[in-house]
Amino acid sequence: MEQLARLYHDHLRVLNQRVCEILSRENLSGLVIHSGQPHRQFLDDLDYPFKVNPHFKAWLPVIDNPNSWLVVNGTDKPLLIFYRPVDFWHKVADEPNEFWAEHVDIKFLTKADKVAEYLPADIDEWAYIGEHLDVADVLGFARRNPDSVLSYLNYHRATKTEYELACMRKANEIAVTGHQAAKTAFYNGASEFEILQVYLSAISQGENQVPYSSIVALNENSAILHYTALEHTAPAQRRSFLIDAGANFNGYASDITRSYAFEKNIFDDLITAIDNMQLQIINLMQPGVSYAQLHVETHYKLAQILLDFDIVSGDVQGLVEQGITSVFFPHGLGHMLGIQVHDMGGFLGDDKGAHIAVPEAHPFLRCTRELDVNQVLTIEPGVYIIDSLLNELKQDKRQSQINWNTVEVLRPFGGIRIEDNVIVHRDRIENMTRNWGLNR
C-alpha cells in the first residue's frame, strides 16, 4: 500500500498538469466534477445500482458515494466535497482515511442540495463535468461538459500513469483467480448460474461491483457475443465453456475472456489455434502501430485458420475481402481499457477531438488510434458459429465457399474468444493477464 500511495502522489501531479493545460487553453478557472447521483426506478422507491462518473474516479478511488464533488484547478490541492448525510435507513460512507485522503482537502456535505455553499463563488468561470445537467443548471454553470475539455481529457486518459498501471495489474490478478475457479467449476459439472457464483465468490466482488456484466456461456450460448441470460440447469451434454469476466480494483477494470472444450476434439484444437493467433497479434504491438491495422491483420490470420480447419475454401485474400472472415469474427479486436471497460478516447486522433474513422469493412472496431507508451488495451480475437450471420451469407454466392458439414460439427460448441489485457511499453509488451498465470 505504501508503494501505491507513492504512485498516487505522482498520479495526481500528472492529472493536475493536464488540467492546467486545458484550463489555459479554454480560459477556464477550473473543473467541478460530479460523482453522480442515484437514479430512481420508474414507479418505484428503489434506485438502480450507482455507477460513478468516470472522470471523478480518475482522480480518486471513491466509486460508491453519490452526491460527492471534486473541485480542481490544476494548481491548488483538489477539494473533495464528500457526501455524508444523517441517514438511519442506509449505510453512510465512512470518513476517508485511505492512502489518497492526505492528498486532497475534504469537506463533508450532509445535504445534497446544499452543495452550492462549498463551490467557487465565480461558478460561471468553471466547467461542470458530469451527467446531471439539470443540477448544473440550478447551480449556475454556464459551461457543462465542454466538448473541447472532454476530448482533451479522454485523449490523454489513454496514457496511463504508473499508479493506474499498478491498479490494473491488481485487477488482472483478482480476475485471474476467478477465472481459474470458474474453469474448475465447468469441468465439475456446474451450470452457468453456478459458475458465475463461483467466480464472484473467488474474487470477493458482487455483480454490481465488477466492471461489467459477466458472460458465462455453455455450449451454443458461447456464440452469443454478449450473452448474460444464465441458465440455472446444467446441460445434459457438456461441450464448451466461454467466460468473459473482469474485476475491479480502485475503480480500474480488468476484462478477460477464456474458452474451453470439455473433451479433446476439433473444437479444442480450434481453441489452441485461436490462442496462438492471439499471441501472434500481441507480438506485433509496439508504439506507432495502428490498432486498426492489427485488427485487419487478425482477419488475415483467421482466414488461414478457417482454411486449415476446412471450415471454408478459397484463399486468404479473398476470404477477407469478401467479408467471409467477418461472418465468423464480427466484432472488433479489442478496445482501450482503464477506469472504464471500453475506455474513452479510442477514436481520437489528437486532444482537440479529431476523429479517426473505423475501416469501412469493420464497423464494430472500438479503437483506431496508433499505439503509444503506457496505453492499455485488450486483444480478443474469436471465431463463432452465428446462425443469423451465416443465414445472410447463404443468400449469395459466398455460400459455396463454406464447408457446411464442418459448420454443423462446430455449431453445438458455439464460439471461441481469447482476451488478454496488455500494456504497451517503449521496448516491450506486458501481458498482465498471462503474467498472473492464466494461459491456455
Curated annotation (Swiss-Prot):
GO terms for biological process: proteolysis. It comes from the Bacteria. Pfam families: PepQ_N, Peptidase_M24. GO terms for cellular component: cytosol. The keyword Hydrolase applies. Binds 2 manganese ions per subunit. Mn(2+) 2 binds at residues 244, 255, 419. Mn(2+) 1 binds at residues 255, 335, 380, 419. One of its GO terms (molecular function) is aminopeptidase activity. SUPFAM superfamilies: Creatinase/aminopeptidase (SSF55920). Its EC number is 3.4.13.9. Its cofactor is Mn(2+). Keywords: Dipeptidase, Hydrolase, Manganese, Metal-binding, Metalloprotease, Protease. It catalyses: Xaa-L-Pro dipeptide + H2O = an L-alpha-amino acid + L-proline. InterPro entries: Creatin/AminoP/Spt16_N, Creatinase/aminopeptidase-like, PepQ_N, Pept_M24, Peptidase_M24B_aminopep-P_CS, X-Pro_dipept-like, X_Pro_dipept. Belongs to the peptidase M24B family. Bacterial-type prolidase subfamily. Splits dipeptides with a prolyl residue in the C-terminal position. This is Xaa-Pro dipeptidase. It comes from Shewanella halifaxensis (strain HAW-EB4). The lineage of its organism: Bacteria, Pseudomonadati, Pseudomonadota, Gammaproteobacteria, Alteromonadales.
